[in-house]
A protein has these predicted regions:
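Active-site loop-to-helix "anion-binding N-cap" substructures in soluble metabolic enzymes
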Residues: 32, 36-190
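Short, positively charged and aromatic/hydrophobic N-terminal segments
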Residues: 6, 13, 24-38
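Intrinsically disordered, low-complexity segments enriched in serine/proline and basic residues
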Residues: 2-18
Length: 190
């Protein structure tokens, strides 16, 4: 993201410093010499961070099955509970970002994350404030130490194009980024 905050979570931390170093790859793919970045890839995890008063932008995987307006399998929701509860217990505000289905940058009512709110509240044990990305800043301002769920990020046209402006809008909402959605981490999305 090139974001102004620490990146923590399951997969990768954007390095604070980089320097290009030539590396001899031998005959790999017909390439004899290439340049790679030597980076400080030390891990930062939530349990080692000061979260008190911090807004923790947390990518989660809650792309769950729904029938007749109800979540039918809460497995993915159950998996995010420890992370969300840790943020809350540490005095932080978890701001959840997720996708649901494939709306391709269009608002599709049937793919709104609002349907997941009752299941999230039951699993986490606290109320969840649901908001659009456009109203997220105001919602977060009044949600200290509460859970905020932002509407389906794939409603945003730039999400699947890895739009830097969308990434910056998201980055501006948090002080810390946590990737708790390993299943979506490989995607080059905003």
């Amino acid at each position: 993201w090139g974001a102004p905050f620490d990146l923590v979570g399951n997969l990768i931390k954007f390095p604070a410093k980089e320097k290009a170093q030539p590396v001899d790859l031998g005959p790999i793919s017909g390439v004899n010499r290439a340049t790679f970045r030597e980076t400080d890839m030390s891990w930062k995890t939530l349990d080692k961070m000061q979260l008190m008063g911090k807004r923790v932008l947390t990518r989660v995987d809650i792309n769950v099955p729904v029938e007749n307006g109800r979540v039918t399998d809460t497995t993915r929701i159950d998996r995010i509970v420890p992370t969300v509860q840790h943020i809350l217990k540490s005095g932080g505000t978890p701001i959840l970002i997720a996708h649901f289905g494939r709306p391709k940058g269009q608002i599709v009512d049937a793919l709104s994350l609002k349907v997941t709110v009752p299941a999230l509240e039951a699993a986490i044990g606290v109320p969840v404030k649901f908001t659009s990305l456009d109203r997220a800043r105001e919602t977060i301002a009044f949600a200290k130490n509460q859970v905020v769920l932002i509407e389906n990020i794939r409603f945003e046209p730039g999400e699947e194009r890895n739009d830097p402006q969308l990434a910056q809008r998201l980055a501006d909402l948090g002080d810390i980024y946590c990737n708790d959605a390993f299943s979506a981490a490989h995607r080059a999305h905003a």
